[in-house]
């Protein structure tokens, strides 16, 4: 059996309208790269990045979902095992911000009750084209008791900070397991979070 190279596995999900920059946010964090020619995600895709927090190696499995309505049933099935969900809107697109309330409802309907949520106002490098004031993002985050960052995948603003903050928030409420605990086997099951036996 291959030696496990991490202590914990956190499944994260990026959701939001098509075109808000979810894939760019993910690639900036996972590969420190930015590409202006991404095509829309078809269905679902994921990346893995291992980070170290509080002396623990944490493998982040980050799922990038399609924002289009026609993929709705595919993507909602991925909400269940998610431990952290980033809701992304585009500060230059008012409709993408209005739809955040719809995405929040999707989380309530499909995700685990204790999932950590975070709101990201992306493309903050395009301030000259801004239509969503920062205060509006802060307000909706306050109303729902979630963290908020304005980010830019292009200019690499707050991307790493957002992911690490979300991971820290999850870590804070993750029960500490004894190192010799025998009931944990993450090596099987293709990387899904089978070890978190909260839901049935």
UniProtKB/Swiss-Prot annotation:
Keyword 4Fe-4S in annotation: no
Residue positions of covalent lipid attachment, annotated as S-geranylgeranyl cysteine: 199-200
Broad class of where this protein is predominantly found: membrane
Impact of altering residue 23 to N? Probable dominant negative mutant locked in the inactive GDP-bound form; alters the basolateral recycling pathway in epithelial cells and endoplasmic reticulum membrane morphology
Residue location of crosslink Glycyl lysine isopeptide (Lys-Gly) (interchain with G-Cter in ubiquitin): 102, 136, 154
* Keyword line: Acetylation, Cell projection, Cytoplasm, Cytoplasmic vesicle, Cytoskeleton, Endoplasmic reticulum, Endosome, Golgi apparatus, GTP-binding, Hydrolase, Isopeptide bond, Lipoprotein, Lysosome, Membrane, Neurodegeneration, Nucleotide-binding, Phosphoprotein, Prenylation, Protein transport, Transport, Ubl conjugation
Q: Does the keyword Protein transport apply?
A: yes
Q: What is the effect of changing residue 73 to D?
A: Phosphomimetic mutant. Reduces interaction with GDI1
Find motif (Switch 2) and give its ranges: 64-81
Q: How does it assemble?
A: Interacts with MYO5A; mediates the transport to the plasma membrane of SLC2A4/GLUT4 storage vesicles. Interacts with GDI1 and with GDI2; negatively regulates RAB10 association with membranes and activation. Interacts (GDP-bound form) with LLGL1; the interaction is direct and promotes RAB10 association with membranes and activation through competition with the Rab inhibitor GDI1. Interacts with EXOC4; probably associates with the exocyst.
NCBIfam families linked to this entry = small_GTP
Report the function annotation for this chain. The small GTPases Rab are key regulators of intracellular membrane trafficking, from the formation of transport vesicles to their fusion with membranes. Rabs cycle between an inactive GDP-bound form and an active GTP-bound form that is able to recruit to membranes different set of downstream effectors directly responsible for vesicle formation, movement, tethering and fusion. That Rab is mainly involved in the biosynthetic transport of proteins from the Golgi to the plasma membrane. Regulates, for instance, SLC2A4/GLUT4 glucose transporter-enriched vesicles delivery to the plasma membrane. (Microbial infection) Upon Legionella pneumophila infection promotes endoplasmic reticulum recruitment and bacterial replication. Plays a role in remodeling the Legionella-containing vacuole (LCV) into an endoplasmic reticulum-like vacuole.
Domain notes, please?
Switch 1, switch 2 and the interswitch regions are characteristic of Rab GTPases and mediate the interactions with Rab downstream effectors. The switch regions undergo conformational changes upon nucleotide binding which drives interaction with specific sets of effector proteins, with most effectors only binding to GTP-bound Rab.
Q: Give the protein name, as stated in the record.
A: Ras-related protein Rab-10
Species per Swiss-Prot/TrEMBL record = Homo sapiens
